[in-house]
Amino acid sequence: MRKLRAGIVGCSGIANDKHLPAIQRNGNFEITAFCDLFEERAQTAKETYGTPDARVYTDYRELLKEDLDVVYVLTPNSTHAEVSIAAMESGKHVMCEKPMAKTYAEAKAMVDVAHRTGKVLNIGYQCRYRADAQYLKQA
């Protein structure tokens, strides 16, 4: 089975602490593109987690021109909708870090684009099954 080609938009904090190590351990992905406003962060992520021919960008729109299966959106919360929508419109599936968006309207736009394009939009709500989250849900 072919590995999925992943692009990473946002290469600090949560990317290095959680997502990139997990993607690397998974074994079903190859990370072939990295983007961050600070090129050195993207370059460091590439050297640690990328394929030998992985490319580095400072503009996510350039990364979206790559032949990718999925884009991980690990950017500041205020940019989640913009980047996710652009990724789906360019033919990529999206894994977006939480929160999904700033407003209901942005979140709805993301879902609408996912339906229109047929792309998977996954939001990283990984805490919903923790004991404290389940307790609050039942309260």
Where are these regions (language model features)?
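Short, conserved SAM-binding/catalytic segment
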Residues: 44-53, 109, 113-117
